[in-house]
């Protein structure tokens, strides 16, 4: 019984070489065809400014000029696409400026979006009945936490939205989302 390993390795046959070339060609062609499809399906990373700030956009991803929001009557809650595309309420103040605090339209119970009810002066979640005060604090559960807030600034005619990292003015504590 010969337990020795053959010294010579078998050479690649013509058939194996052609199979390898065919497989490599198919793989390269498929990769070249799928790359543009992948780029189309995956949203590009949004460019952010200092501190993660972005420009407020509409539902189509177009920048919203500050003059458009400020033309609304005082106490209007304008819904824009904010950080990471999250729907965010901007509030027009009595002096026709924007409040420096924006509210993210995302219920802290199960993540539903909700409308502002001007008659009751509350945000009311239709999913499970949570209610929020105009500043985003919880009026009635089951929501366990106040709404996430963001910083809002107007520079020239652009609305900048950036993450809120300071003390939460509603609770006096570190924000729960930081």
Swiss-Prot record:
Broad class of where this protein is predominantly found: membrane
UniProt enzyme class: translocase
Cofactor: [2Fe-2S] cluster
EC number: 7.1.1.6
Localization annotation: Cellular thylakoid membrane
GO-annotated cellular components: plasma membrane-derived thylakoid membrane
PROSITE patterns: RIESKE (PS51296), TAT (PS51318)
Catalytic activity: 2 oxidized [plastocyanin] + a plastoquinol + 2 H(+)(in) = 2 reduced [plastocyanin] + a plastoquinone + 4 H(+)(out)
Residues reported in the UniProt entry to bind [2Fe-2S] cluster: 107, 109, 125, 128
Binding note for cofactor: Binds 1 [2Fe-2S] cluster per subunit.
Record InterPro entries: Cyt_b6_f_Rieske, Rieske_2Fe-2S, Rieske_2Fe-2S_sf, Rieske_Fe-S_prot, Rieske_Fe-S_prot_C, TAT_signal
NCBIfam families the record matches: Cytb6fFeSPetC, PRK13474.1
Name the record gives this protein: Cytochrome b6-f complex iron-sulfur subunit 3
Organism whose genome encodes this protein: Nostoc sp. (strain PCC 7120 / SAG 25.82 / UTEX 2576)
């Amino acid at each position: 019984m010969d337990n020795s390993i053959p010294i010579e390795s078998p050479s690649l046959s013509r058939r194996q070489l052609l199979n390898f070339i065919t497989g490599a060609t198919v793989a390269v062609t498929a990769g070249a065809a799928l790359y543009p499809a992948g780029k189309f399906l995956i949203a590009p990373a949004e460019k952010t400014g200092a501190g993660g700030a972005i420009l407020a956009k509409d539902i189509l991803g177009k920048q919203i000029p500050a003059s458009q929001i400020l033309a609304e009557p005082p106490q209007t809650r304008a819904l824009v696409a904010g950080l990471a595309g999250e729907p965010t309420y901007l509030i027009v103040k009595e002096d026709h400026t924007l409040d420096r605090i924006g509210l993210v339209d995302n219920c802290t119970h199960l993540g539903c979006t909700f409308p502002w009810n001007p008659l009751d002066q509350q945000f009311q979640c239709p999913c499970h009945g949570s209610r929020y005060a105009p500043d985003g604090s919880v009026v009635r559960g089951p929501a366990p936490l106040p709404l996430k807030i963001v910083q809002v600034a107007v520079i020239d005619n652009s609305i900048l939205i950036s993450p809120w990292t300071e003390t939460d003015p509603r609770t006096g504590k570190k924000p729960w989302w930081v």
